[in-house]
């Protein structure tokens, strides 16, 4: 199971630009910057796709506010989940790893 979540990064470039772009992937709408600028870098593209899924999740959570009664709760839990997963993604970039985030990794495979 751990092999499916943690991918090896032996052949990733060690440039500072790659890690900066990968870090931008988890900062909301800034996920589009590495997605459009670094399509040839596999390490950055992996993190950008995960950041895109997290951003789409946060946008969908905003629409949940329009639901009566449970909208605020759904938005709160979704926002908390996105925040925790974004911090986990930033930690994986800081550790120079490619870690499939839980639940997000499934949707990234569909992109």
From Swiss-Prot:
User: According to the record, what happens upon gene knockout?
Assistant: Deletion of the probable mamGFDC operon leads to a slight reduction in magnetic response and slightly narrower magnetite crystals.
- Cytoplasmic side of the membrane: what ranges? 1-17, 72
Q: Which residues lie on this side of the membrane: Lumenal?
A: 39-50, 94-111
One GO term of the cellular component aspect? Answer: magnetosome membrane
Tell me where it resides: Magnetosome membrane
Q: Which UniProt keywords apply?
A: Biomineralization, Magnetosome, Membrane, Transmembrane, Transmembrane helix
Instruction: Give membrane topology per the record.
Output: Multi-pass membrane protein
Give the transmembrane ranges. Answer: 18-38, 51-71, 73-93
Question: How this protein is processed and modified after translation, per its record?
Answer: Probably subject to cleavage or degradation.
Entry function: Plays a role in regulating magnetite crystal size; partially redundant function with MmsF.
Which family does this protein fall into? Answer: Belongs to the magnetosome MamF/MmsF protein family.
| Miscellaneous remark of the record | This bacteria makes up to 20 cubo-octahedral magnetosomes of about 45 nm in diameter which contain membrane-bound crystals of magnetite (Fe(3)O(4)).
Give the protein's recorded name: Magnetosome protein MamF
Give the species: Paramagnetospirillum magneticum (strain ATCC 700264 / AMB-1) (Magnetospirillum magneticum)
